[in-house]
Amino acid sequence: MCGIVGYIGTQAATDILLAGLEKLEYRGYDSAGIATVWEGEINCVRAKGKLHNLRSKLELIETPAQIGIGHTRWATHGKPEEYNAHPHVDTAMPVAVQNGIIENYRELREELKAKGHVFRSETDTEVIPHLIAEILKNFSASSSSSDFLEAVSQAVNRLEGAFALAVVCADYPDELIVVRQQAPLVIGFGQGEFFCASDTPAIVAYTRAVLPLENGEIARLTPLGIEIYNFAGHRLKKQPRLLNLNPTMVVKTGFKHFMLKEIHEQPGVVRASLEAYFNNGRGKWRSPINLRLPENLYTDLEQIHIVACGTSWHAALIGKYLIEQLAGISTQVHYASEYRYAPSPLTSNTLIIGVTQSGETADTLAALAMEKERRQGKEAKYEARLLGITNRPESSLLSHLVPNIISTLAGIEIGVLATKTFTAQLMAFYALALDLAAHRQTASKETLEKIINGLREIPKDIESTLESQERLTEQLAHEFAETQDFIFLGRGINFPIALEGALKLKEISYIHAEGYPAGEMKHGPIALLDAKVPVVAIAVPGSVYEKVISNAQEAKARDSRLIGVTPVKDGEAGEIFNDLLPVSHVEELLSPLLTVVPLQLLAYHIAARRGLDVDQPRNLAKSVTVE
């Protein structure tokens, strides 16, 4: 959600901080600010709205400061106003930025007010610099080089909640202190300079050597090096790792928006997944899939529970379908935010899968942590079997919770809306379902080979769909830009695609849209239909094709304009649908990888036609790191 950037070194800090904040815009924000230290003074500049407002203010101020922190804020405590924007400063000069929530800020605020501290915002973050200042004030007159670090450490030990911090102070101009407690923060290593950020895209232009902090760690960054401690004050020895990230991933490379670029990157995502997950006939494998998961994860498996949020939840629904149909394992999909407070009864030999693009989704991590805790100390059959599916294997998911990961291979996704990461999650579920089927021998070798061969053709099929759909969806966008409501229908494995299509449209165009199982339309949603409510129906030849066509006819009888996502261009489909968004003809089991593409493009073009911010839609954050 919020984005943090910090710098200390030999270059002008302001430009580096601004560039880093631009790379974190995808996380969502409503205000921004930067604070630098120069000649014993703090220069703090904040602005409501987009970064260009902050940049305009900074252009009026020239400072050669070589240390500073920056922040993009997504409002949780207090309105999105300039006075609530970060950084927050105490008159004694500590300055802090924070991502997360301080749960006990009210009692700390009252305690500090009683000691004479004056607060100027409504945020929870403002207690942090005041608390640090109060602790520094109580230190002895003989200052120590470790005073600032010690003050931040003492302050952090009084904070309750999930947060990441970056703090500077005018009295300690050569120190940048950073903290992680259940919110992401990564340190970057340069030559005589160091960086910190909420996410690696902010610093990849300057360094490939990074070290993600772990929960309960605090680091002091100086021009001479980095010291890392735990909250108990014990120094830790840690080494950075080299980041395998191409800088072109964080630029548009000729596309108007990141979202459009990322939609067009999906064939490459499927190819990368095929290369990584499938053995290509090499080696003596029991399964044609190579996910590098331990055998005991599959042993005597009876049930699977999947926890996820948003688009990842839709991917999980397709995963459920694949696992049950191919591997014959009963699978349940839960909203992580609900599962935390109403978990299923404890069952034996159960695999718990957490799906999170960022690896930092607060509710998903909390659901996995709860599952891990409630199974601890139980007899062997109840032991926690945890698996994560994430696009960020360096995230909290692997480092703190889940010993087993299927790393999706989408690369960095900058657009707030999940497009290529959704496809990457689907590929992970195809691989998992096929691997389970091979291990359990619930599908013949010939069946597995047929599905895998079909998957190998998918990249070309997506490329063909993209080539044909760009113009068609752009034309439809012109006609539907002022539409107020949409209905999306699907059945079987394509019902989750109807949900995903509706979610994409409402997220980016702010048009009310709902997805339904096509068979449920007559049980309520049909009351909404008239000439002003278009209906998008996903009709793929297979077990439910005729049923979807029948449901579509019911909508047409109520004067709704029908848009068909289908490989069938003539016959009954050609007569029923007013508009066709054709996709290649593939096995029904593989069709979600294709049917989602025109729905992504339709949402994109409608939003662009309406003149909206495609890559940063209002009120949304790429990584939801608070509950």
Swiss-Prot record:
Keywords: Aminotransferase, Cytoplasm, Glutamine amidotransferase, Repeat, Transferase
Residue ranges annotated for the Glutamine amidotransferase type-2 domain, each copy included: 2-224
Record domain SIS: where: 293-442, 476-617
Compartment(s) where it occurs, according to its Swiss-Prot or TrEMBL record: Cytoplasm
GO terms for biological process, alphabetical: carbohydrate metabolic process; fructose 6-phosphate metabolic process; protein N-linked glycosylation; UDP-N-acetylglucosamine metabolic process
Residues of the active site: 2 (nucleophile), 622 (for fru-6p isomerization activity)
CDD domains from the UniProt entry: GFAT, SIS_GlmS_GlmD_1, SIS_GlmS_GlmD_2
GO MF assignments: carbohydrate derivative binding; glutamine-fructose-6-phosphate transaminase (isomerizing) activity
Recorded catalytic activity of this chain's protein: D-fructose 6-phosphate + L-glutamine = D-glucosamine 6-phosphate + L-glutamate
Enzyme category, top tier: transferase
PANTHER family, sorted: GLUCOSAMINE--FRUCTOSE-6-PHOSPHATE AMINOTRANSFERASE, ISOMERIZING, GLUTAMINE--FRUCTOSE-6-PHOSPHATE TRANSAMINASE (ISOMERIZING)
Quaternary structure (record): Homodimer.
Record protein name field: Glutamine--fructose-6-phosphate aminotransferase [isomerizing]
